Amino acid sequence: MTLLSSADTLTLHGQTFASRVLLGTSRYPSLQSLSDSIAAARPGMVTVALRRQMNAGAAEAGFFDLLKRHDVPLLPNTAGCQTIAEAVTTAQMAREVFETDWIKLELIGDDYTLQPDPVGLIEAAALLVKDGFKVLPYCTEDLVIARRLLDAGCEALMPWGAPIGTGKGVVNPYGLRVLRERLPDVPLIVDAGLGVPSHACQVMEWGFDGVLLNTAVSQATHPEIMARAFAQGVDAGRAAYLAGPMDARESAHASTPVVGMPFWHQDGSHA
């Protein structure tokens, strides 16, 4: 049973996706585990790193074939790139290998936090948009950088919740919620740092359009079960957002209004 209407779909660059979950494909214990997780999450897209595919050994020989069998749209990424030239070249190679003009643009500026390089990210995004790519940039919750990426031609953004692989959940709720509030018409997909389904549910309740998951699923004890749990959490959060949650209050407010006399006094049988 689904919580949402089939009409409530994620739209990116004019293309609709039935699921608001995007799933990464790295670091699973086995290809079977990856396959089971994709089947459980039923993601709208799966991300794939060009370098992984090019460097795949015998154990990974069936990786691309597995993705084809699931028939899920691919979102190549530029993971590991640290310069503009490297990111642009990797994106162009990925377009040839995976036969898609979609690209998740990653340009890392710090090896410790894996924080994006904001200046290089904007320039690389502009170059790739000009080259015909549909660019989904991995960025922080910085509103000014987000606007510059939109000015560069990006139509959707992928702000982090926390540094990649930390599983901390959203570390700056204020900044992320301000980003959502100030860019109400821009598709925003929270990427990185989510650790458990409640984290995903939370950002969906705030009105974000989707989440991208990898480590939280692939490093779980049971990835398939976690993938399904995340998908359910995303659906629940989206449904709650669409339902219009009540406003939080500082003081208690009775849920049952008291009007007149108790019902057992109304028949006159009690003094």
UniProtKB/Swiss-Prot annotation:
Taxonomic superkingdom: Bacteria
Enzyme Commission number, as recorded: 2.8.1.10
One term under GO cellular component: cytoplasm
Biological process, per Gene Ontology: thiamine diphosphate biosynthetic process
Entries under SUPFAM superfamilies matching the protein: ThiG-like
InterPro entries to which the protein is assigned, alphabetical: Aldolase_TIM, Thiazole_synthase_ThiG, ThiG
Entry keyword set: Cytoplasm, Schiff base, Thiamine biosynthesis, Transferase
Protein name (database record): Thiazole synthase
Highest classification ranks of the organism: Bacteria, Pseudomonadati, Pseudomonadota, Betaproteobacteria, Burkholderiales
Gene: thiG
